[in-house]
From Swiss-Prot:
Origin superkingdom: Eukaryota
GO molecular function terms listed in the Swiss-Prot or TrEMBL record: alpha-(1,2)-fucosyltransferase activity; galactoside 2-alpha-L-fucosyltransferase activity
Native source species: Oryctolagus cuniculus (Rabbit)
Note in the entry: There are three genes (Fut1, Fut2 and Fut3) which encode galactoside 2-L-fucosyltransferase in rabbit. They are expressed in a tissue-specific manner.
Cited InterPro entries: Glyco_trans_11 (IPR002516)
Glycan attachment positions: 197, 291, 317
Top-level EC class: transferase
Designated name of the protein: Galactoside alpha-(1,2)-fucosyltransferase 2
Membrane topology: Single-pass type II membrane protein
Compartment(s) where it occurs, according to its Swiss-Prot or TrEMBL record: Golgi apparatus, Golgi stack membrane
């Protein structure tokens, strides 16, 4: 028995006609490009995308067809790094306390994710616009009523900056604010290269000096002061020991002032920070890889001390008794009980024009 062949020969004229109607390679490439661009565009409309290159470091929220029954909690992303760390930790703790899932704004993710291994999912603006949020204002410290917020879709507001919100979850907060390996390793490599009078130090004290806008805001708005030369002398002397002298690693958003006002004649002070407020990762990592902390004022220094552990010295009583700052700030809720406060010299600091 004979079988028909698997192919049919075409006459030359038919072959030429087929070639004439077959699309060219450039046409196929163009159509494929249009298909890919269209697919990406439609996916972008449906998914809550996060700006590169850190999109992989957190779960991304898809716009829901129906709002989840368990609710959704988020928080306003206000301020720079220290403020947003406080907001993140507060959202993490209060949402857990109230049994609600927590989501962070994309803006907060862009600030924190390049530095830390945060885990909360990201709430894109396209999702946020579909949620019937109820704003819930927080004071700067924890209150009992925050443990029972009977609202499913909450947007927390304010500038919470107190350990009283989350200290009972300290280990979880430290895990959330674990540095990325490359950030930590760069800081550790810098510290390993430091020498005190020719010897490698065994103890590092991170020093953060807040200057910048606070130089104007504290006296003009809050009837207060920033750290002066006298405070920093006392704070560094508190850590100096004759047997195992530490090295002081100074960071600040006013490095020129620090070089003029911090005595480095003993050879144990290193002016290490770059002072760039827009890219704080290097300075923050250096502080957290030290053993102890000298802070002045502000949330950046607080978080450096909180993550570092060890001993912390801070500037205390830096506002006048009638300062409006006392309406929004409680020192006992801002500084851990075991930290050591050195009282600011209000008179000398105000006269010096700081």
């Amino acid at each position: 028995m004979r079988f028909a062949p698997d192919y049919v020969l075409c006459p030359p004229t038919a072959t030429r006609r087929l070639r004439a109607t077959h699309p060219s390679v450039s046409t196929i490439y163009f159509l494929f490009t249009i298909f890919v661009v269209s697919t990406v565009f439609h996916c972008h409309q449906r998914l809550a995308l996060v700006p590169a290159p850190w999109a992989y470091s957190a779960r991304v929220v898809v716009v829901p067809g129906h709002l989840p029954r368990e609710g959704m909690w988020t928080i306003n992303a206000m301020g720079r790094l220290g403020n947003q760390m406080g907001e993140y930790a507060t959202l993490y703790a209060l949402a857990k306390e109230n049994g609600r899932p927590a989501y962070i704004p994309a803006q907060m993710h862009s600030t924190l994710a390049p530095i830390f291994r945060i885990s909360l999912p990201v709430l894109h603006s396209s999702t946020a616009s579909r949620v019937p949020w109820q704003n819930y204002h927080l004071n700067d410290w924890m209150e009992e009523r925050y443990r029972h917020i009977p609202v499913p879709y909450v947007r927390l507001t304010g500038y919470p900056c107190s350990w009283t919100f989350y200290h009972h979850l300290r280990h979880e907060i430290l895990r959330e604010f674990t540095l990325h390996d490359h950030v930590r390793e760069e800081a550790q490599a810098f510290l390993r290269g430091l020498r005190v009078n020719g010897s490698r130090p065994s103890t590092f004290v991170g020093v953060h000096v807040r200057r910048g806008d606070y130089v104007r805001v504290m006296p003009q708005v809050w009837k207060g002061v920033v750290a002066d030369r006298g405070y920093l002398e006392q704070a560094l002397d508190w850590f100096r020991a004759p047997t195992a002298p530490p090295v002081f690693v100074v960071t600040s958003n006013g490095m020129a002032w620090c070089r003029e006002n911090i005595d480095a004649s003993r050879g144990d002070v290193v002016f290490a920070g770059n002072g760039l407020e827009g890219s704080p990762a290097k300075d923050f990592a250096l502080l957290t890889q030290c053993n102890h902390t000298v802070m002045t004022i502000g949330t950046f220094g607080f978080w450096a001390a909180y993550l570092t552990g060890g001993d912390t010295v801070y500037l205390a009583n830096y506002t006048a008794p009638d300062s409006p700052f006392h309406l929004v700030f409680k020192p006992e809720a801002a500084f851990l009980p075991e930290w050591v406060g050195i009282t600011a010299n209000m008179g000398r600091a105000l006269w010096s024009g700081l």
